[in-house]
C-alpha cells in the first residue's frame, strides 16, 4: 500500500543508510521500525500491580475515610488518628 508520510530529513537519511546496510528497501526498514515500536508499546502497557498491605497499615476503626466531615472532626478534636482505634 502506498502512502505519504512527512518525516525529518535526518530520520529519512538514517533509514536510507539502514536500508543500504541491510540490503532492504526503505519501506521494509520503516515497516520493521514501526512493528518494533508497536510491539514495545503493547508490552509496556501492562497494568502495574498495586500492593496490598495486611496487618495494621490500613484505615483505623471509627474513622469514615469517605466523609470529609468525619475526618475534619477528628482533626479539629486535636486527637491523633491512632488514638481512635
UniProtKB/Swiss-Prot annotation:
It comes from the Bacteria. The keyword Kinase does not apply. Antitoxin component of a type II toxin-antitoxin (TA) system. Upon expression in M.smegmatis neutralizes the effect of cognate toxin VapC31. The gene is vapB31. InterPro entries: CopG (IPR002145). It comes from Mycobacterium tuberculosis (strain ATCC 25618 / H37Rv). GO terms for biological process: positive regulation of growth; regulation of DNA-templated transcription. Induction: Induced in persister cells in response to D-cycloserine. This is Antitoxin VapB31. Keywords: Toxin-antitoxin system. The keyword DNA-binding does not apply. It holds the Pfam family RHH_1.
